[in-house]
């Protein structure tokens, strides 16, 4: 299963245009699998920094009766980070340059999430 997860994360990193890295992590911010594409990308720091915020996103979605949180996107001047919540405590994240195509990133993340759900 770990090999399949590694392949899924690797495929996500290769498919997303201008991707700097992809990570499958626990809600605690601990990486399960990660693929760094661009030198200098620190996915472990991203996982650690966003872990608390992802907990808040999940809680807020529940509190506002939105249903289960599915995705969370951070758009900055230099980078875009998209997180998708898997079943249990897993989160899939991908970081791309701000010029990455939003629709293409969402589609690639959705495909990767369906693969993770099948494993």
What are these regions (language model features)?
Residues 1-119:
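Non-catalytic interaction/Regulatory regions outside core domains
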């Amino acid at each position: 299963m770990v090999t399949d997860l590694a392949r899924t994360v690797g495929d996500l990193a290769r498919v997303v245009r201008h991707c700097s890295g992809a990570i499958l992590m626990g809600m605690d911010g601990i990486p399960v699998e990660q693929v760094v594409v661009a030198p200098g990308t620190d996915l472990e720091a991203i996982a650690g920094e966003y872990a608390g915020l992802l907990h808040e996103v999940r809680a807020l979605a529940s509190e506002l009766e939105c249903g289960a949180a599915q995705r969370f996107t951070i758009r900055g001047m230099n980078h875009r980070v998209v997180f998708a919540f898997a079943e249990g405590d897993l989160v899939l994240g991908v970081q791309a340059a701000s010029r990455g195509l939003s629709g293409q990133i969402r589609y690639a993340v959705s495909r990767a999430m369906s693969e993770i759900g099948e494993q």
